[in-house]
Amino acid sequence: MNDTLKYYEKDPIYKKYIHNQITFSMAYFYSENFILPFSHDEVVHMKGSILNKMFGDYDTKFALVRNLYAYQFAHPGKKLNFMGNEIGSFDEWKEFEPISFSVLDYPKHQGLQRLIRDLNLIYENHSSMYVEEYNPKHFSWILADNGDQSVYAFKRESEEECVIFVFNMTSNFYWDYDLGVPYPGSYEEILNTDKAVYGGWNQYNGLPCLTYGNGIHNQKYKITFKLPSYGAVYLVYNKKQLIDSKKPSLGKNENNTATIL
């Protein structure tokens, strides 16, 4: 995850020049069974805490660290986080001092802790985030080369569902972001790191996103949704929609008896 942290440290103006630091991990991911660690080694010996590594001012650092953890949970592979990362400690780890839980007196830190809790719940309740994660058939990029916008998107699938993960790595806000998706129907937002409960500006998608028009990004269909600054969005598609759409509907003939259409 070293390349990942270096990417998040970078000024967004220059991120398009190091765009592949995020995509490169999937080029070799299936060669071994990887763990994704933000371990103690990243937050000692004058390296700074995870939060302090992030680019920008106070609000931007928190927005980016929320994005970072959403990316870690979305990425295939088992997760590992060192104690204190989940509350957004500003101090790096000191082995002879306790973790600075006093930061939880402040709303931004409370929001980050709540996000980590919800990420764990989402991970537990959505099979596409852990079933067959070392099988390349269950992952594919939707947006891997959009360096100009520094937006990434990929999908992970299980038999029951498909989850779309989208990450905006700059301060640009998109009211109507178009994204290609693989299946027709409704995509429900299950995570938005910009929600106020996480310390964000509450720019989220309250209604399901419905497919329409022609597909883009080498996908058959398209949705439009709100993509906040430095935001990460999870959209889930329940594959039961595919089954229901293939079921014959019942109509009535002239004798008022049911007939299959």
Q: What do these predicted ranges mean?
A:
Residues 33-43:
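Extended, charge-rich helix/loop segments that form flexible
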Residues 32-34, 78-79:
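Short glycine-/polar-rich loops that comprise or flank the Walker A/P-loop
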Residues 15-17, 41, 46-47, 58-62, ...:
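Carbohydrate-interacting/catalytic domains
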Residues 1-28, 35-37, 49-60:
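Extracellular glycoside hydrolase catalytic/binding regions
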Residues 28-30, 158:
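Flexible, charged surface loops at secondary-structure boundaries
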